[in-house]
């Protein structure tokens, strides 16, 4: 016998379904559910008098050896580059093993996830599930960045550094074997995935190659160490040999050549460009044009995202501190001024919206904010909708109804998840909500989406969660704050997080030599990449910058936007 529910009643009980829309935080962005893999009337829900009980939604006869999941997230709305849909998500041995319909096949048809006595339940009803964020521009200045990143929904940190040394405060570099191996050991107790960049500055190849064999997953070329054409070429030669990435912060002062010289030195080889607009550093005033090349994987850092009335004013002091400049030296001030251009910053939001810039990252404590990658990405998406309207798929693909924001949502979620993972050769393990991936997942209340997660899972175990007073009689009394959970303690840290290394370092026995206990994965497939491999952000137009006015054009059309006066996902959510 069937029973009819209104959409509101159904959403209250089991979460929204196909055709329903969800507003993301206090933005003007609306997610529309494209499909529902659960079965109407057979939804699994946990609780007193609910479905997931022995002989009902739970099969009491199967053992864990019969591929029963360790955890099922029920009735969650998944927001991912792969789609926007509702499903049950099964996790086993720290990986996503199935996305579909959970329950007990003895009493329900269409079940492809069997809930057993070994299965924990996380209620995903009325929640949004995303992949953990991947931040590819980390200055490892302070260990306190790790919980800050995790509590924002970022589960992977890629970059370089040794602590608050001058080299680290300016450049994402962990220089040399000794520092690389000490940092690998230091991060063993941190419940986050880690990858380190070596220093990409040497006039010979071997000083670079030895860093890759020591455990670096790539090389960083930075102007503060001298972003010369020889450094670029040698780093890329080593990268080609060992299948690792080269990240670059180019030459603001144009001392060693102009952007055209850097492009020639790169020579068509794949490279990951940081803060490609230029305020964070790079050929003045036209580094932004490199984003149109098919071999360049271009990123923004979050200080310039989105463009607001305060963006220009705050940058000068940040830059002076981060790059060890002296405000009493006119040349240092001129250097800083040359990097801060309202015209190129105004173009950056639009280039993100057009899918030309493909990645967002933080530049943590070195002009960027490690806990704001996700928030600022969605602030840009909201600002662009308000200024440019609904974004349509230029390929004509179907992404929900005519006025849905689904295409824009897929483009923007890809920027800090799958595209960042692809750029660093990590996408086989992380970066999306797909079967076979490491279960780094973030569960959001829609009202707090992109601002404050409800749960952060690392390798299938809860690492951080919104939690109330531990002395209270229930979990929810105020103050509710993001607090470390059991995956952040003891030996669980090693089983729930990944240390990424080069294959050469693994072959050389670095994990055994250093006694590394985290899950070890090799980066791979990097040197064959092109921008076409990036999801929803693969545009390669002709970008030009007027050297006098700094006006930016894309295929001959002016590209700019107005600064925002007010942003969503801001003071409404934060006291400080």
UniProtKB/Swiss-Prot annotation:
Residues with the N6-carboxylysine modification: 220
Cell location: Cytoplasm
Quaternary structure note: Heterotrimer of UreA (gamma), UreB (beta) and UreC (alpha) subunits. Three heterotrimers associate to form the active enzyme.
Domain Urease positions: 132-576
Catalytic activities: urea + 2 H2O + H(+) = hydrogencarbonate + 2 NH4(+)
InterPro entries: Amidohydro-rel (IPR006680), Metal-dep_hydrolase_composite (IPR011059), Metal_Hydrolase (IPR032466), Urease_alpha_N_dom (IPR011612), Urease_alpha_subunit (IPR050112), Urease_AS (IPR017950), Urease_asu (IPR005848), Urease_asu_c (IPR017951)
Active site as annotated: 323
Residues the record lists as binding Ni(2+) 2: 220, 249, 275
Modifications made to the protein after synthesis: Carboxylation allows a single lysine to coordinate two nickel ions.
A molecular function GO annotation: urease activity
GO biological process, one term: urea catabolic process
Record pathway: Nitrogen metabolism; urea degradation; CO(2) and NH(3) from urea (urease route): step 1/1
Protein name: Urease subunit alpha
Residue positions binding Ni(2+) 1: 137, 139, 220, 363
Species classification: Bacteria, Bacillati, Actinomycetota, Actinomycetes, Micrococcales
GO CC terms in record: cytoplasm
Keywords associated with the record: Cytoplasm, Hydrolase, Metal-binding, Nickel
Residues that hold substrate according to the record: 222
């Amino acid at each position: 016998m069937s029973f009819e529910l209104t959409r509101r009643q159904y959403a209250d009980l089991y979460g929204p379904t196909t055709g329903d829309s969800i507003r993301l935080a206090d933005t003007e962005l609306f997610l529309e559910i494209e499909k529902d893999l659960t079965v109407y009337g057979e939804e699994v829900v946990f609780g007193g008098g609910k479905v997931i009980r022995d002989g009902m939604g739970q099969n009491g006869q199967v053992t864990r050896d019969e591929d029963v999941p360790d955890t099922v997230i029920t009735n969650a709305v998944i927001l991912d580059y792969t789609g926007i849909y509702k499903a049950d998500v099964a996790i086993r041995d720290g990986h996503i093993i199935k996305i579909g319909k959970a329950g007990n096949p003895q009493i329900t048809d269409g079940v492809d996830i069997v809930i057993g006595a070994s299965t924990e339940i996380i209620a995903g009803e009325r929640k949004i599930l995303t992949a953990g964020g991947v931040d590819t521009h980390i200055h490892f200045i302070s260990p306190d960045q790790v919980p800050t990143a995790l509590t924002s929904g970022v589960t992977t940190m890629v970059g370089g550094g040794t602590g608050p040394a001058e080299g680290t405060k300016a450049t994402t570099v962990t220089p040399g074997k000794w520092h690389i191996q000490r940092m690998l050991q230091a991060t063993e107790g941190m419940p986050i995935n880690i990858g380190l960049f070596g220093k990409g500055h040497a006039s010979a190849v071997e000083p670079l190659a030895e860093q890759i064999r020591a455990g670096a997953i790539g090389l960083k070329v930075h102007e503060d160490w001298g972003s010369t054409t020889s450094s670029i070429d040698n780093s890329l030669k080593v990268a080609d040999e060992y299948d690792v990435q080269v990240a670059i912060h180019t030459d603001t002062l144009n001392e060693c050549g102009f952007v055209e010289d850097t492009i020639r030195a790169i020579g068509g080889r794949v490279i990951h460009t940081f803060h490609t607009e230029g305020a964070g550093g790079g050929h003045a005033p036209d580094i932004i044009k490199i984003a149109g090349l098919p071999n360049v994987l271009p990123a923004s850092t979050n200080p310039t995202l989105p463009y607001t009335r305060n963006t220009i004013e705050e940058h000068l002091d940040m830059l002076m501190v981060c790059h060890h400049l002296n405000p009493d030296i006119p040349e240092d001030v001129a250097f800083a001024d040359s990097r801060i251009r309202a015209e190129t910053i105004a173009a950056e939001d639009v280039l993100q919206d057009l899918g030309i810039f493909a990645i967002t990252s933080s530049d943590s404590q070195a002009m960027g904010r490690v806990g704001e990658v996700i928030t600022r990405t969605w602030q840009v998406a909201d600002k662009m909708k308000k200024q440019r309207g609904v974004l349509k798929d230029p390929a004509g693909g179907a992404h929900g109804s005519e006025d849905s924001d689904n295409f824009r949502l897929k483009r923007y979620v890809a920027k800090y998840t799958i595209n960042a993972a692809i750029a660093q050769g990590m996408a086989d393990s992380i970066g999306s909500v797909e079967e076979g991936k490491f279960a780094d997942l973030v569960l959001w209340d829609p009202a707090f989406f992109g601002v404050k997660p409800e749960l952060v899972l690392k390798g299938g175990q809860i690492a951080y969660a919104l939690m109330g007073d531990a002395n209270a009689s229930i979990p929810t009394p105020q103050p509710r704050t993001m607090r470390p959970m059991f995956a952040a303690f003891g030996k669980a840290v090693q089983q729930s997080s990944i240390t990424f290394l080069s294959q050469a370092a693994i072959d050389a026995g670095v994990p055994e030599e250093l006694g590394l206990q985290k899950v070890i994965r090799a980066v791979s497939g990097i040197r064959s990449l092109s921008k076409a491999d990036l999801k929803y952000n693969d545009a390669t137009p002709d970008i030009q910058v007027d050297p006098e006015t700094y006006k930016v054009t894309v295929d001959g059309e002016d590209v700019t936007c107005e600064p925002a006066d007010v942003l969503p996902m801001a003071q409404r959510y934060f006291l400080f």
